[in-house]
Amino acid sequence: MTVHIKVYSDYVCPFCFVGKAAFEEAIKGKDVEVEWMPFELRPSPSPQLDPVNDPSKQYMWQTSIQPMAEKLGVEINFPNVSPHPYTDLAFEGFHFAKEYNKGHEYNTRVFQAFFQEDQNIGDIDILTKLAEEVGLDGASFKSALETRTYQDVQRQALKHAYEEADITAVPTFIIGDTVIPGAAGKDVFEKAISDEQKKK
């Protein structure tokens, strides 16, 4: 039986990127259906993070994020985009991509652009280039972002995450009835999937 999984994450969350890699290893070859769910850690107009000029954030990167990434075999770089962009436009692009069955590919590409290539994922032109790289029509994508076609869709997605699903931190993985908060190892995800399959 197919195990349904929801993954709540934000594109500027390093733990989301690290956890995504381990999660995707765990689900390879398994009968699962994954739904990627938007979550904005700092929606506009909240103050933006500026880790480049914040020694405490750099310390956390060196002592927590980098070691976890190395342990899980994930290539991740400290993003020098300053300050960190809001992710509402990137998520509006995700909703566009989903309509063309490219949500997963787009998701992966945006994470890579921010955490491996230092690209500003709050910039429409950059997001359009990333969309084209995964096979989406650039002109239609750019127009959708400029006219905020998916703004209400994204607002509803956030309302769901904050109020209905009561998500307070990301990443959060909901595997059937099992909730896994934070980045976890491949074995944790595999056990949760196996446990869910045994229930069916």
From Swiss-Prot:
InterPro entries: DSBA-like_thioredoxin_dom (IPR001853), Thioredoxin-like_sf (IPR036249)
PANTHER family for this protein: GLUTATHIONE S-TRANSFERASE KAPPA, ISOMERASE
CDD domains in UniProt: DsbA_FrnE
Organism: Bacillus subtilis (strain 168)
Protein name in the entry: Uncharacterized protein YwbO
Gene Ontology MF: a single term: oxidoreductase activity
